[in-house]
From Swiss-Prot:
It comes from the Bacteria. The lineage of its organism: Bacteria, Pseudomonadati, Pseudomonadota, Alphaproteobacteria, Rhodobacterales. It comes from Roseobacter denitrificans (strain ATCC 33942 / OCh 114) (Erythrobacter sp. (strain OCh 114)). GO terms for biological process: glutamyl-tRNA aminoacylation. CDD domains: GluRS_core. HAMAP family: Glu_tRNA_synth_type1. This is Glutamate--tRNA ligase 2. GO terms for molecular function: ATP binding; glutamate-tRNA ligase activity; tRNA binding; zinc ion binding.
Length: 466
């Protein structure tokens, strides 16, 4: 029977949830959720000087926005330090690690001499095979005994087989002289203890895999499945940085991108399923696999992100979309909508969501429904309200006051009125938009009338006719 899949996301709490980290978390989440497995969260907070509670919270908030729920309790790597140290002592007792008394000055002198002579700077400790009786009463580190012959093969699900000669591996430090464990050891022990079966992470960790395999093998533990995914680059092909724009997941939340669209885009960033660009969360969970991840760095493309976000907004249920739009206003520091405005936003949703790519665009398109009387037209719309058009609106309004308020009937009334004026409805649209919304670019006049209702529509037309 195949063991259940267990993946993990293991960020360091030294800043916000980077867009690359968000994608790594998403890939792990999709792989586990699509296979009925577990997705675990570990905070790698061993660097006490740089780790902060605020950064941890920012990571959690970013994951919550993206809907990446984790199983079980959050694991703190720092809290497991005693366990990591105990494992190092196990290896020492088993003869698979040793005490090294070399000082930093001695190691630095060795490397300087090696560079000067054109030799490898890989440090070979003279203490590896030293008898215990020769050990001085001095500070020491614990080093693993790296294999000195043969090869280590990283069987990676994305990069393929990566072979490293064992004579290129050093006797890595496991425990510092102050008794604290190093990151390499902590990661292996935590992944083992958490039951992680698949390690999906950035390919900047690929070289670490060979060193971590030394620890797995020395302990007789099963090595997890490796999947080292390519990094994200900017549109210019260079590593993603601030010059390319926003880097943090929450920055995109504050800018008003829908979480579903961001999930879809991040999933497609380096992974593909045929020619499918737009897909639902359920489809992503079903389709996601490691075989579909490419080796080359993916390029972040804001236009593609916006396109997918627009499709997700258009496909969303109106009630859910209204809730998301209001949540966006809260996180971006904007005033909450009144109960009346919230109701009107919900009514307008059907006619504004088709072309909005972000929540600011969506709310802007709902301006006609959210604004209060009297409607003040902007400069461009005001040009449509000259004396002639005001007179036309004044004449039109009585014909609407007792009308049956359905689209077909409203279209018939306005087209007949335009015909009576020996013109086309298009000529009336400008003044009507200005009167109803105060703008020249709006949803269709008929949609605005249906959303506003007969009383508000006629009141706005009367206001504009004065």
């Amino acid at each position: 029977m195949t063991a259940p899949v267990v993946t993990r996301f293991a960020p360091s709490p030294t800043g916000f949830l980077h867009i690359g980290g968000a994608r790594t978390a998403l890939f792990n989440w999709l792989y586990a959720r699509g296979r009925g497995g577990k997705f675990l969260l570990r905070i790698e907070d061993t660097d006490r000087a740089r780790s902060t509670p605020e950064a941890t919270q920012a990571i959690l908030d970013g994951m919550a926005w993206l809907g990446l729920d984790h199983d079980g309790d959050i694991v703190s790597q720092f809290d497991n330090a005693a366990r990591h140290a105990a494992v190092a002592m196990e290896l020492l007792a088993a003869g698979k690690a040793y005490k090294c008394f070399a000082t930093q000055e001695e190691i630095s002198a060795f490397r300087e001499a090696a560079r000067a002579d054109g030799r490898s700077t890989l440090y070979r400790s003279p203490w590896r095979d030293a008898a215990q009786e020769a050990h001085p009463d001095a500070p020491f580190v614990i080093r693993i005994k790296a294999p000195q012959e043969g090869e280590t093969i990283i069987r990676d699900q994305v990069q393929g087989d990566v072979t490293i000669r064992n004579d290129q591996l050093d006797d890595m430090v496991l425990l510092r002289s102050d008794g604290t464990p190093v990151y390499m050891l902590a990661v292996v022990v935590d992944d083992h203890d958490m039951g992680v079966t698949h390690v999906i992470r950035g390919d900047d960790h690929l070289n670490n895999a060979a060193r971590q395999m030394m620890i797995y093998n020395a302990l007789g533990w099963d090595v997890p499945v490796w999947a080292h995914i390519p990094l994200i680059h900017g549109p210019d092909g260079k590593k993603l940085s601030k010059r390319h724009g926003a880097l943090g997941a929450q920055e995109y939340q504050v800018m008003g991108y829908p979480a579903a669209g961001m999930r879809n885009y991040l999933a497609r960033l380096g992974w593909s399923h045929g020619d499918d660009e737009f897909f639902t969360d359920a489809q992503a969970r079903e389709w996601f696999d490691l075989d579909g991840i490419g080796k080359s760095p993916a390029r972040f493309d804001t236009k593609k992100l916006e396109n997918l976000c627009g499709q997700h907004i258009a496909a969303s249920q109106d009630a859910a979309l209204r809730q998301e739009a209001e949540a966006f206003r809260a996180v971006s520091g904007q005033p909450a909508l009144t109960a009346s405005q919230s109701h009107m936003l919900g009514k307008a949703m059907y006619c504004i969501k088709e072309r909005a790519k972000t929540f600011p665009e969506l709310i802007d398109k709902a301006h006609f429904a959210l604004t209060q009387r009297p409607v003040t037209p902007d400069a461009k719309a005001a040009k449509s309200l000259d004396n002639v058009s005001r007179g036309i609106l004044k004449e039109l309004t009585p014909q609407l006051q007792n009308a049956s308020w359905e689209r077909e009937n409203l279209e018939a009334i306005l087209n007949a009125f335009a015909h009576s004026k020996d013109t086309k409805f298009g000529k009336l649209a400008g003044p009507l938009r200005a009167a109803l919304a105060g703008r020249s670019v709006t949803p269709s006049v008929f949609d605005m009338m249906l959303v506003l209702g007969p009383e508000e529509t006629c009141a706005r037309l009367n206001d504009a006719a004065v």
